[in-house]
Each structure stands twice: as structure tokens, then as C-alpha cells.
């Protein structure tokens, strides 16, 4: 046994925890030393971190930090040995180490060489090992296993605090003034776990060949070339780890005509199966298969086959088990469901041909009336237009059957989405992304021609709006309680705007759309954690009121930050004519206080940097890193095991103690109507949407689930995500974690 080395490790524990807390731990440590008298430090650290995890339970939740401290000691010892320095000097040499890693192709050379050696040395001095004490064991292990830089032998060459600094350095390398201070501010925000960036940024910032955006949405054109071009674009994004939403509502239905030949089309299902194959085969260098959500309108003739795509029975030739599905629902359909009236299904190609318009290209501008229901009724009344008739409630039953068996389809409430779209002057929003929180203008990229010029094949396509999501989230339980929102949010908005400039997207129309709208998605996580710390029950008016007040504050600070950034960098190119410019964004939401009027005036006069600003993603994996609860979701259990393919780690609810335990009620026992009320309160302050899950028992009756959907629609939810039943396991999009 190396007494000196163990003394250092033990001394750190004694400084961080009381003797009473570690009484059982020291007893187990003594037993280990007796059994391994020649045991080395690394073996002791490994063995005792496992013992600490075994001691973790609801009465002793602090053992996750004991295990994290021991694991962190192992990491520092390993990296210090590699760098040939003492553990206490491991961060001091990071500036020189960064140059070596860039020379080896492990860091992006353009990032490192954009800073002088003097600047690298200064930034290295900011690295604060004590902030590792904020990590739970599962949080630290997740960060190390999945995100810190490793060499070509998969050995760790970067420590957690250095990952935070590299993200800050990467995202601010093109800043023209006060660059180091902006890097330092971003490092402060990240290392204190006040915020996280999206997982692609977390994983790829500062590394070669990595893209930084989270999710994408494509609109498929109704042509053979358009369908295959879209599939190729999806594949090119999927290989970099992006989660993708695909809107198929413009593609003609089964039995539609092709070039005048009747009953020639095979409909959307075969093309969705092609996307399913893409998701499975383009598997991100073997790490995990791609993630694609396909959306279809509820009036599309193929909707019933679409709803059966993920079912476990029936004709396998009509199944796509690896695709996630979403339905686009107008107000009129929900009204027909509630009234138990008939619903009509149409072929979008036939509607375009006979009616001279596309039904999907319009919506109800006002509740209860508008262009969509007028045109829908015209289609119903046109006897020349073929149509299928089915009770609306029967379609809803099919939806709910699929949801209870598979968790999907997601719901996209298209009328409310487009009524609240701040950029309706430039287009339509047809669907959402993989996690239902991103809602931005969309349009199909159209093939124009292929020619040979100078013995080179040249293909021309007219670019559509191919949506890109750039995400970051606030850790509510830390940032709100520490009172740092006013300092934090401008840092986040600047970082997100910088991602737009730095990102190297493989799809040109996506790059174009990103620059036209400069859309970002600032969100939150740790909501249940915050409620528990504030001693507020989930099922209470106090929780609803807090959601309203807090998200109005976050919205104000986010809009203010983007408006201030516009004064420095200019507005997004499509600002003129937007709700932002005209001031209707503020009046629609009843923002009439003095500070809101002043902000409205500022935006109208000097603009806003980002056309879309807020979105609440699922962010389950980054919430694990930050040691808090995911998104706006309640916890599953107070104690559970986080299972990955190669390990199983016990976890307790964050900051679980005799005071907070009473406020951690399991998701499956919470009245979901209170969840809807909370989200109605926050949704009015969020210009995009929220990944809103329903948690239900597998014994739920159809009428109860229907009541949830109807209330969500009536409360002006823009979307709902999974229906999570106790009988099914579901997978979140890692890319949307932020």
C-alpha cells in the first residue's frame, strides 16, 4: 500500500465530507487495506468508488459525490502521468498540451492557433478543479465516457474542466473585442453547471470534422428526384449524429396518379421504409443508429397505414419499426373528434391538381375560422375530388392505440403553431423535429436540372428552408437559486449565435436557412429539481404560477440579449415584416409592462439577432451530466439505476433529503392535467415549443388519454412528445439534449 498516495486521496474526502457521513466508508476502506496490503492507489480508488456506489440510497444520497471524487482522482492521476507532471500541475500545462493535441489531429488546429501561447497560458490558469465537486458520479462518468477528447487508442487526453474551456474557446474564437473575457464568462457558465450546450457541441467543439447543431427538419417534395434527394440529405446529416424531422405531407398517397396514369402511386409508406433503412444503416460510425421522425397530415389518405407503421403485428412489409411518427393536427380535426363527426381524407396531389391549391399550405388564422377550414370544406363539397370518410374519433382511437403500444405518434397542433409563428411573413411551419420542440419555417428543396458542363455533371436545385436547431439549456435548480439568470442568458445567446457562424453543415440549404433566420433554441432543465428545492408540489397552483413568472423572465432576458446582440452584429436577414419588427409578437402575448414596452421599442428600432429564440428540449443526457432532472419532466423514481450497454449505476433524485423527498412524486402517479396547466403557463412565453411527455399507467382508459389530448389542444399546446406508458421503454434523441 502506498500510504502517501492514499493519504492524499483520503485527505480530500475528509475535507469534503463529515466523519459521520463516511463512517461506513472508512470501515470498508480499512477492510480493503487489510486484504490488499500492497494495493496501489489506482486499485484503491477504483474499489472504493464501487463501494461508495453500493452505499448510495435514499438515506445516503451524498455517496454519489464520494464516488465521483474518487473517480475524478483516478482521471487526474492518469492524465498527469500522460503529461509527465504532478497532479496539482495537470491544468497548468494545458496550453502546451492543447498545441500537442492539435498537432496530433485531436484538436482542431484552427481553434488552437487562433489564440497566442500567452492567451492559452492565461486561459489555463482559469481551470478550477474544485468545480468537479458539482458532478455526481453518473454525471462525471457520462461526460468522460462520451464527450471528453480521447486519442486514437481511446485513452483520455482531456479532463472535464478542459472540455468546458475548449467549448468556450471554440465558440468565441472569432470574437473581435474582449475575446478572452467572453471565453472566461462562458467557462464560468459551463463549469458551474449553470447551463449546458447541445450534445453535438459538447462532443465536437474544438475537435476536427464535427458539426455543432442538434436537429434538422426537411420538407420532402412530391417528386421521385425530391424524395431521393431528401433521403440523401438525411443520410449526410445522420452520419454526424443529427436527429432529423421529415415532413412527408406533400407526397401523393397510395393509388394517386403519376403523369396521368391512375392508381400508379404506392403512397408514402415505401418511402418511409427507405428512411427507416437509412436510419439503421447510417449509424454514426457504428456508435448508434440514426434517429428520424416522419410527420404526416391527419387528412392524408395514407394516414391509417402511417399510424400502423410501428405496430408489432400485421404485414411486416408495411412496418417501419425504427422510425418515429408524428401527426399534424388542425383545430378542425380536434373539433370533429370532440363532436364525434366525420373526417375526410384526401390525396394532396389530387387536391393540388383539381382544386388549384395545397391544403397543407394554409391554416386557420383565427380560432374557429380561417383559410384551412374554408378550403377543407371546399374539398369535401367537390364531388370530382376522391375522398375517404371515417369518424374522426376512430382515427383518434388508432392514434391512442399506437401511443400506448409504441409511445408515438407525436402531436403537432399546426394551427396554433402557425398563428404564433413570428416569421409567418416568410413561410409556413408544416411539422416539428425529432423531439417536437423546434418550430421554424419550412419548404421543400426542388430539383431543377442536371447538365454536363466542361465534362462535369452539374445538378441544380432550388433551395428550400431546411431547418437547423442550435440548442442550449439553463440548469434551473442552480441558475435560478443562485440568481444568475441576468448574467447567464446573454452568454448563452451569444454562444448560440456563434454556433451559426462556426458550423460546417454538410447540406447547403441547411446552411442557407440557418443564416436567413439565425434560429436558436434556448431551453431549460431541472424543473422538478427546482420545485423540490422551493418546496412546491407538482400538482399545485404555486407550480403553475412559478412556471408563468419564471418563463416570462427567461423570455424577457432572452429577447433582450438577442436585441442587444443585434445592435452589435445586425438583425437576422428576414427581420423586416416579422412579428418582431411590427411589434405584434409582444401584443399577442400581452406584454404591456413598462420594461416590455421599452424592449418592444428597442426591437422595433434596432432589430433582433435571431428569428427564433426559445425551445425546451428533452435534454436527458445533459441533465444527467448536470446532476438534475430532465427538461420540464417529473422524475420516474426517487432511486433508480441508470443502465447503459456496459454498466448499471445507482442514482437518486437530485439533492434528495428529508425536506425535498416529499416533493419528488413519480411521473406515473402525477395527475397529468397539472402538467398540462404548467406547460400552458410556460408555452405562451416560448416562441417555439416544448418536449411535453405524458406519463400514464398501462391500465389507462381511452377516454382518460383522450381527455389529456383534448385539454392539451384547448390549452394551446403546440405539440406533445411521447405518451410514456409503464409498459413501454422509449428512447430520447441524444442530439436534442442540451
Annotate each PLM feature.
Residues 119-122, 132-142, 436-440, 496, ...:
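Catalytic alpha/beta core of large soluble enzyme barrels
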Residues 49-52, 67-73, 189, 203-207, ...:
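A glycine-rich phosphate-binding loop feature that marks nucleotide/adenosyl-phosphate handling sites
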Residues 265-273, 280-393, 397, 401, ...:
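Conserved catalytic alpha/beta cores of large enzymes that bind or transform nucleotide phosphates
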Residues 231, 489-511, 537-619:
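Internal maturation/activation junctions in enzymes
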Residues 149, 155, 162-179, 183, ...:
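Function-dense linear segments that define catalytic or interfacial modules
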Residues 63-102, 141, 329, 417-448, ...:
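Terminal amphipathic helices with adjacent charged low-complexity linkers/tails
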Residues 1-165, 181-187:
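Core nucleic-acid recognition elements
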Residues 4, 155-158, 177-181, 200-208, ...:
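Alpha-helix capping and helix-loop boundary segments enriched in small/acidic/polar residues
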Amino acid at each position: 500500500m502506498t500510504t502517501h498516495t492514499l493519504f492524499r486521496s483520503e485527505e480530500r474526502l475528509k475535507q469534503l465530507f463529515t466523519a459521520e457521513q463516511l463512517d461506513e466508508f472508512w470501515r470498508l476502506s480499512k477492510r480493503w487495506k487489510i486484504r490488499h496490503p500492497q494495493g496501489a492507489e489506482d486499485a484503491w480508488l477504483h474499489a472504493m468508488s464501487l463501494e461508495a456506489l453500493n452505499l448510495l440510497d435514499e438515506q445516503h444520497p451524498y455517496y454519489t459525490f464520494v464516488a465521483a471524487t474518487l473517480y475524478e482522482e483516478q482521471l487526474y492521476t492518469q492524465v498527469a502521468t500522460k503529461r509527465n507532471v504532478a497532479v496539482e500541475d495537470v491544468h497548468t500545462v494545458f496550453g502546451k498540451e492543447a498545441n500537442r493535441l492539435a498537432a496530433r489531429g485531436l484538436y482542431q488546429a484552427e481553434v488552437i492557433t487562433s489564440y497566442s501561447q500567452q492567451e492559452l497560458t492565461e486561459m489555463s490558469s482559469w481551470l478550477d478543479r474544485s468545480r468537479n465537486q458539482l458532478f455526481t458520479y453518473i454525471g462525471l462518468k457520462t461526460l468522460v465516457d462520451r464527450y471528453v477528447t480521447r486519442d486514437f487508442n481511446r485513452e483520455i487526453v482531456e479532463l472535464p474542466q478542459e472540455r468546458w474551456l475548449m467549448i468556450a474557446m471554440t465558440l468565441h474564437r472569432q470574437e473581435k473585442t474582449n475575446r478572452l473575457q467572453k471565453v472566461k464568462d462562458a467557462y464560468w457558465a459551463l463549469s458551474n453547471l449553470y447551463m449546458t450546450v447541445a450534445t453535438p457541441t459538447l462532443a465536437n467543439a474544438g475537435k476536427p470534422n464535427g458539426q455543432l447543431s442538434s436537429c434538422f427538419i426537411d420538407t420532402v417534395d412530391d417528386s421521385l428526384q425530391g424524395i431521393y434527394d431528401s433521403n440523401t440529405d438525411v443520410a449526410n446529416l445522420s452520419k454526424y449524429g443529427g436527429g432529423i424531422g421529415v415532413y412527408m405531407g406533400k407526397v401523393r398517397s397510395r393509388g394517386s396518379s403519376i403523369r396521368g396514369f391512375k392508381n400508379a402511386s404506392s403512397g408514402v409508406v415505401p418511402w418511409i421504409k427507405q428512411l427507416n433503412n437509412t436510419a439503421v444503416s447510417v449509424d454514426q460510425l457504428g456508435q448508434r443508429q440514426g434517429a428520424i421522425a416522419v410527420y404526416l397530415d391527419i387528412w392524408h389518405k395514407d394516414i391509417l397505414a402511417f399510424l400502423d407503421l410501428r405496430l408489432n403485428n400485421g404485414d411486416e412489409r408495411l412496418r417501419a419499426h425504427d422510425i418515429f411518427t408524428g401527426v399534424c393536427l388542425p383545430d378542425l380535426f380536434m373539433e370533429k373528434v370532440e363532436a364525434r363527426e366525420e373526417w375526410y381524407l384526401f390525396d394532396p396531389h389530387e387536391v393540388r391538381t383539381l382544386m388549384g391549391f395545397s391544403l397543407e399550405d394554409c391554416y386557420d388564422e383565427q380560432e374557429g375560422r380561417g383559410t384551412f377550414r374554408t378550403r377543407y370544406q371546399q374539398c369535401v363539397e367537390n364531388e370530382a375530388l376522391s375522398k375517404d370518410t371515417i369518424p374522426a374519433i376512430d382515427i383518434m382511437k388508432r392514434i391512442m392505440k399506437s401511443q400506448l403500444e409504441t409511445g408515438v405518434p407525436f402531436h403537432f397542433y399546426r394551427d396554433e403553431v402557425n398563428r404564433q409563428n413570428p416569421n409567418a411573413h416568410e413561410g409556413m411551419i408544416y411539422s416539428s423535429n425529432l423531439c417536437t420542440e423546434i418550430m421554424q419555417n419550412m419548404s421543400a428543396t426542388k430539383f431543377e436540372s442536371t447538365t454536363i458542363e466542361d465534362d462535369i455533371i452539374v445538378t441544380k436545385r432550388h433551395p428550400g428552408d431546411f431547418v437547423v436547431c442550435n440548442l442550449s439549456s439553463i440548469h434551473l435548480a442552480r441558475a435560478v437559486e443562485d440568481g444568475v439568470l441576468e448574467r447567464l442568458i446573454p452568454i448563452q445567446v451569444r454562444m448560440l449565435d456563434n454556433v451559426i457562424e462556426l458550423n460546417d453543415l454538410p447540406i447547403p440549404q441547411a446552411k442557407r436557412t440557418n443564416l436567413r433566420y439565425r434560429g436558436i433554441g434556448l431551453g431549460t432543465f431541472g424543473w422538478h429539481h427546482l420545485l423540490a428545492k422551493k418546496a412546491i408540489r407538482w400538482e399545485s397552483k404555486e407550480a403553475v404560477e412559478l412556471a408563468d413568472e419564471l418563463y416570462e423572465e427567461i423570455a424577457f432576458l432572452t429577447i433582450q440579449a438577442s436585441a442587444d446582440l443585434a445592435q452589435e452584429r445586425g438583425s437576422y436577414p428576414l427581420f423586416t415584416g416579422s412579428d418582431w419588427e411590427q411589434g405584434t409578437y409582444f401584443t399577442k402575448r400581452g406584454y404591456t409592462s413598462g420594461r416590455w414596452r421599452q424592449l418592444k421599442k428597442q426591437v422595433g428600432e434596432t432589430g433582433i439577432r435571431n428569428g427564433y429564440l426559445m425551445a425546451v428540449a428533452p435534454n436527458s443526457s445533459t441533465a444527467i451530466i448536470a446532476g438534475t432532472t430532465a427538461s420540464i419532466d417529473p422524475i420516474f423514481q426517487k432511486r433508480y439505476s441508470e443502465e447503459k450497454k456496459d454498466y448499471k449505476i445507482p442514482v437518486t433524485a437530485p439533492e434528495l433529503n428529508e425536506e425535498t423527498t416529499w416533493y419528488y412524486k413519480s411521473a406515473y402517479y402525477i395527475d397529468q392535467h397539472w402538467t398540462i396547466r404548467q406547460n400552458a403557463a410556460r408555452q405562451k412565453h416560448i416562441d417555439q415549443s416544448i418536449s411535453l411527455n405524458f406519463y400514464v399507467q398501462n391500465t389507462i382508459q381511452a377516454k382518460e388519454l383522450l381527455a389529456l389530448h383534448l385539454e392539451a389542444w384547448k390549452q394551446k399546446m403546440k405539440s406533445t412528445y411521447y405518451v410514456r406508458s409503464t409498459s413501454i421503454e422509449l428512447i430520447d434523441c441524444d442530439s436534442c439534449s442540451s
